[in-house]
Design a protein with these regions (language model features):
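Metal-cofactor-binding active-site regions of metalloenzymes
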Residues: 1-183, 190-197, 202-203, 207-208, ...
Length: 229
């Protein structure tokens, strides 16, 4: 059987044991044991997308070196394999890991290296979708340019982060540039904002909607949603 995971966040899937290991290695104080990691992500039951996203600051803090990124990507793909997944698409906001020792391309390369190691060992095929953060228009523009410059290293372009007041149409120029380069577009919409944001995502070239749970509020757009929605 051919099983696929098409929506996953690399910074949301660290093994608790790895988070503890990397926190100790990097002297990151908020994480001292595996329970700390679980407590951060218990926020998934929160009704606030913003509160939930805050938990990711702790995992991103551990993704600041080539070796850490490589390990996390490898383990993410390996864990997918253990769950009988053959094809895995993961997304990450690369500029969250850019620092004096890591360029944006280094971040992408490290993640792809981890994916390739898992592919060589287990046969699972993985690909990276790069995310722009919608509350920072300059970041969205920079990630779009990065995607175009290194389109051979990625499989898609996305925007993520807080949705309210950050509609997809704000970034239409970036979406158009990416689309013109033949890069697939997926957009987070219809969670922190209403169904109108899903329609905007479709209007701006999205082939797939991230989350989209509020479509239930208005199913008038259902004919626009295809098999990859």
């Amino acid at each position: 059987m051919y099983n696929q995971v098409l929506h996953d966040h690399l910074d949301g899937g660290l093994r608790p044991s790895t988070a503890k290991e990397l926190a100790k290695r990097t002297n990151y104080k908020p994480i001292n044991n595996v329970d700390d990691v679980a407590n951060f992500f218990d926020r998934s039951s929160s009704t606030s997308l913003e509160d939930y996203l805050e938990a990711f600051t702790h995992t991103i803090a551990l993704m600041q070196s080539y070796s850490n990124l490589e390990q996390i990507a490898y383990e993410a793909a390996a864990d997918m394999h253990q769950n009988n997944i053959n094809f895995y698409e993961s997304r990450y906001a690369p500029f969250y890991s850019v620092n004096d020792n890591l360029s944006p391309k280094d971040v992408i390369t490290a993640i792809n290296s981890g994916f390739k190691q898992a592919e060589n060992q287990f046969g699972i095929v993985s690909g990276l979708i790069v995310c722009g953060m919608r509350h920072d228009p300059d970041n969205v523009k920079a990630v779009a340019e990065l995607a175009i410059e290194h389109k051979e290293l990625i499989i898609g372009f996305d925007i993520a982060g807080p949705e309210f007041n950050y509609l997809p149409s704000m970034y239409k120029d970036s979406f158009l540039k990416v689309k013109n380069e033949g890069i697939n577009i997926t957009i987070h919409a219809g969670e922190g904002d209403g169904v109108h944001s899903i329609q905007e995502a479709l209007d701006n070239g999205a082939k797939r909607i991230g989350h989209g749970v509020r479509i239930i509020e208005d199913i008038s757009d259902d004919n626009e949603l295809g098999p990859t929605a």
